[in-house]
Amino acid sequence: MSNKQFHLERKHNVELKSDIINNIDIQSLKRKITVPNESNYAAMEFVLHSTPSVVSAASTSSDVEGPTKNKQFRIDTTQFKQSSVQDGGSRAAEITNKILFMLTKDNMAFEAIEKEGFKLFIKSVAPLYKLPSRETIINLMEEKYKALSTIIKAELSSVEYLSLTTDIWEDRLNFRLYFGVTSHYIFNNQHKSVTIGVTELTERQSAKYFETWLLDVTNEWKIRKENIVVVVSNAGSHIQKAIKDAFGNDKYLACFGNSLNLIPSKVIELPVIKSISNKIRTIFTYFKRSTTAADKLKTSIDLKLIQYFSSQWISTYNMLQMFIDLSDVIKEILLQCRTAPTMITASELETVKESVNLLKPFLDAIKTISAEPYLMASKAIPVVNTLKTSLNALQPKTEIGSKMKKLLLEQFREGFNFIENEIILSISTVLDPRFKNIHFKNDLAYFKTIGNISRALYTRELHKRPIQNNSTSTNIKNDFWSYHRELVNTIKIQDTVHSNDNEMYYLVQPPIDINSCPIQFWNSDNTVLGKLGRKYLSAVATSFPGERIFSKPGRIILESRCRLSTQHLRQLFFLESLSSEDWQL
């Protein structure tokens, strides 16, 4: 056997039949073997070990194929892939870009790339990739900021309408205050929220200082004043004045979410509620410190007791709700432990239950507006109307419960009694095809809103509103918007509009489904009303999206990041607010 035959049988898994070598047509085979000097060898017939038959010279039209081994890469292809992963290659740049995205989006310290575990992980998935240093990552972050900020500036300069939200937050590690602003706009039929400015408050917090800074930020990001629909803030009077002086009195709006949060926050400060909450907190603390009590609780139910933070009413609510759910188990365990604190009385437990029932509508409302990436201004009035209806439907049985309900209604009237007179909120609600005018309770405020819309449309005719059937059921279900659906089903049209009135004819049409997209509704409308609808549906009512970025301690400024400059913080806030699509990943 020649060396070549030995090589073919050993390396290429074939048998050679030399008696029919000269009869084979190698072009008819599906599997070919290329040898170093093919001209020196005759065509040969191949028999695959896994194939029972011999492929003969007569099988020129046969489609018989044998199993193939994994194809080996060409040397030049392998070298190209290796070089792309190495420093300066396309694959290396892709990996670096994704690492930078991870560090900024997940609020990781830049030192993470120098940790032993991360280095081992990268070595296992990309052995030829060289991790950049911390200094290189910071430089790349600056370059990424320049590139992506240019793109966002182009978007902001091209959009018709946008909203701004502001927030002040504290860096507790370094005892510093920061002021930030976030832009909210619709681009390619998608809502976007981008942090465009962060500054350290090094000067006296005067209205003039904030006004100048806000104007500088909007100018830097190519935002025109006439394109700003609303500026939302939950800050003090000096911020309000700065916004009004910079953009106009009609464009300032107090944060709806913050106003809503203040109502239950004041109620839980009632002495009787605070006293019972402290007793429950003492019980929860005992279970955390006592191994015996904790083990007994664990054998009964696999849950951990949660305590509350005095500054957060939702935390108090969750603690009270958990205590109600576990009260029977907790009572039995406390009776078995000598050093256990005293269980609350039956009347106190009833007070806790009524407190939870009264606060639940507010929790549902907060969850509704917080679950979305942003809250349209058009939802504020419907949320208030639905929440008030839910609250009125509750009938407390105890004296303390009745007192709580009275206080909640008083605080509610104080905060939202004139919400329908807010021009931005009222126009946004009417122009939202899901709500229109069915949630208005103040006829004067409604007709004033129609007048504002009519003047914007250059029309003099005012149209009457649909009236509601007063027999609306007050059976409030678990769904927050169940009351809204009842209103939709019970409205009556008082007057009609002539069919050729294409613009105001919209008002007498039934509302669309609550889960429908109002922006898509107006996108296909090229009338003046459609343009007005797109304008006011771009408005937001709360600074919650900005607070998700600014107000959570430790999200951006970690102990390992506390030495970052204000410029780098501004870049981090901006990059964190962008999506993976914006990063072009």
Name what the model sees in each region:
Residues 8-18, 33-36, 142-151, 155, ...:
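Short, basic alpha-helical nucleic acid-contact segments in DNA-binding proteins
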Residues 124-125, 177, 303-329, 347, ...:
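Amphipathic alpha-helical/coiled-coil segments positioned at domain termini
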Residues 17-108, 112-113:
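Intrinsically disordered, low-complexity regulatory regions of eukaryotic transcription factors
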Residues 197-202, 229, 301, 330-502, ...:
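Extended, C-terminal/distal alpha-helical "rod" segments
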Residues 104-106, 110-304, 309, 412, ...:
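Active-site neighborhood segments
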Residues 1-27:
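C-terminal recognition-helix end and immediately following basic linker
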Residues 4, 118, 133, 167, ...:
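Mobile genetic element proteins and their domesticated derivatives, centered on retroelements
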